[in-house]
């Protein structure tokens, strides 16, 4: 919006220089909107380890929730991760499908690495297969991913089902609980500009 207004103001300047007057447009300053996050009590419910007799779908959803909370990645990114993108020895994941089109390499914490190792043992498949798949080994669609997490959240007593809310929660915890900085958060979130990241900092700091 700001870019459009700047261009329009340039047009108004031209109008004034050519004898037209009386038209002005105030500069647009977007309001800081609240980034909703999952509460600690909700996270405790969502991160509780499922029973050994749980279904593949529930176990997969549990690992997905952990992954979203520990990486801050977008839903469109997580559903495009392939088995080959997970390096458990180096404890890192490579995101090849990002909003900016740039490849990202993100560290994995030890707990998530251990749970991914167990999940991948159960999941099986080839290196080129998608990490988080359906029960038939196919790539999750965006809608299937959304519905799966919605069912998982509700079955664990959490009524909010937003996938992007996990990304906000990651940013909040990184900034507040870990004392992180905007520059590192920008790299972790894959923002193209620091201004986008500073929006999170202004809200959570």
Task: Set out the residue ranges of the language-model regions.
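Conserved catalytic core of the tyrosine transesterase superfamily
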Residues: 1-205
């Amino acid at each position: 919006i700001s870019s459009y207004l700047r261009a329009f103001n340039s047009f108004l300047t031209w109008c004034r220089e050519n004898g037209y007057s009386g038209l002005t447009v105030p500069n647009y300053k977007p309001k800081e909107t609240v980034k909703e996050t999952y509460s600690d009590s909700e996270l405790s419910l969502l991160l509780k380890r499922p029973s050994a007799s749980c279904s593949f779908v529930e176990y997969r959803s549990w690992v997905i929730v952990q992954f979203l909370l520990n990486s801050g990645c977008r839903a469109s990114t997580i559903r495009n991760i392939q088995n080959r993108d997970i390096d458990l020895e180096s404890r890192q994941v490579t995101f090849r499908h990002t909003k900016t089109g740039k490849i990202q390499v993100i560290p994995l914490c030890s707990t998530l690495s251990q749970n991914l190792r167990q999940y991948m043992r159960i999941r099986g498949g080839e290196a080129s297969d998608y990490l988080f798949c359906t029960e038939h080994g196919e790539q999750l669609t965006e809608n299937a991913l959304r519905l799966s997490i919605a069912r998982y959240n509700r079955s664990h007593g959490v009524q909010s089902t937003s996938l992007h809310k996990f990304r906000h929660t990651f940013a909040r915890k990184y900034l507040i609980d870990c004392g992180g900085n905007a520059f590192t958060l920008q790299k972790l979130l894959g923002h193209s500009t620091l201004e986008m990241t500073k929006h999170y900092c202004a809200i959570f700091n």
